Amino acid sequence: MRFLTRLTLVALWCATTAHAGTAIVIGGALKNDNEAVWARIVEEAGGAGAPIAVFATAAANPERSAGLIVAALNRHGANAEAIPVAPRQKDIDLQANLNDPKLIAKVAASKAVFFSGGAQEYIVDTLQPKGEPTQMLKAIWQVFDGGGVVAGSSAGAAIMSRMMFRDAGDNMQILKGQWREGREYDRGLGFVGPDLFVDQHFLKRGRIGRMLPAMRAFGYTLGLGVEENTAAVVKGSEVEIVGARGALLVDLSEATADAKLPAFNLRGALLSYLDRGDKHNLKTGVTTPAAHKLRDQKIDPAASDYKPYLQNENYFLDILADNTIVTAMAQLLDGRAPEVRGLAYRVRPRPNDLSPELGFEFRLYKGPGLVGWFSGALGGEDYTVLKARLDVIPVRMSTPLFTPLAPN
């Protein structure tokens, strides 16, 4: 109850306080040669010479991690500096550095703050112990409220919403409801505001499976899952995707659930895949595709001249596999079938699995508003897909899933 009360106060503070800054949510595995993302961070911070404070608080090897980030930012014109506030950094006094007035002043004078990857619990436990902001965290908020940038990759992205996964297991564990406060989930730092839930490594690791139950449990209607080596630049209500891939926008404003079913279920979710260069307004719901998409092919299943290109009608046996959810959405948009289905389940149930037979069928289907764009201008087969509808239905799987065929 105390946790929920504190969370409510944090949410009210976020909702009633205007934040002028830009949050850059990076999906992890950010490569050194990703010019679009590194350059954008420096640009948003003010350009050449911009002072940027780098926190490798989450990292297993903070000095190495901070050094790589500082070097990448400085190659793009920044004046970045590591702030030695990390539980796993050797030969420092963590509490002394955390409360050092000179370090706090240096952070407050920065134009941007960058959080490294690693273990996100180290960030919140260090900067916001027991839910109370430290002076160092207040300095970071001062940067953000002054129109500066807070960027973070992987663990540094996880802390961007008011709630976050702390040390979650796999997707199936969360889908099956086996998660606890302070273990698998916790409060984040809230830089993207109170109404948007974010997650990272999203398509690579099939994290739609954990985002949906989390959003329902935490009361979110909007979620944004950012893919690896990709960033979502969140400025007020505007979101722009930059980098290598895209992000999945989840809208549960029209979604319902059947309380009679003894497991997680969902009907009427809306999924939109925003590709690199796409922009989306979280308030109006309007998406503006990248310029090269607008010059290419629009796909509207409701149009009289709709001619689907994809001929295969696949059933996806692991809908939570690497990028499979987006592949299924593209097949729905540009295929003949009115729906596309897939399964989420454990082929080999774990010894401590309380529901080894429980699986989930994901049903994507066409409905009003489904539209998209395709382009090969950047050398791939790139789709933008808006408003694919999704149901998640609990099912009973066979254990084992199959048995060898016996000889006659």
Predicted regions and their residues:
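Glycine/threonine-rich flexible loop motifs
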Residues: 120-133
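Structural recognition of the beta-strand scaffold that forms the well-ordered cores
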Residues: 24-25, 51-56, 81-84, 112-116, ...
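Bacterial N-terminal signal peptides
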Residues: 7-17
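Catalytic nucleophile loop
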Residues: 114-117, 139-165
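C-terminal and late-domain segments of enzyme folds
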Residues: 20-48, 59, 63-67, 73-78, ...
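Substrate-binding cleft of extracellular glycoside hydrolase catalytic domains
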Residues: 62-123
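Catalytic-core regions built around general acid/base machinery
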Residues: 102-106, 132-147
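Positively charged n-region of N-terminal signal peptides that target proteins for export
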Residues: 1-6
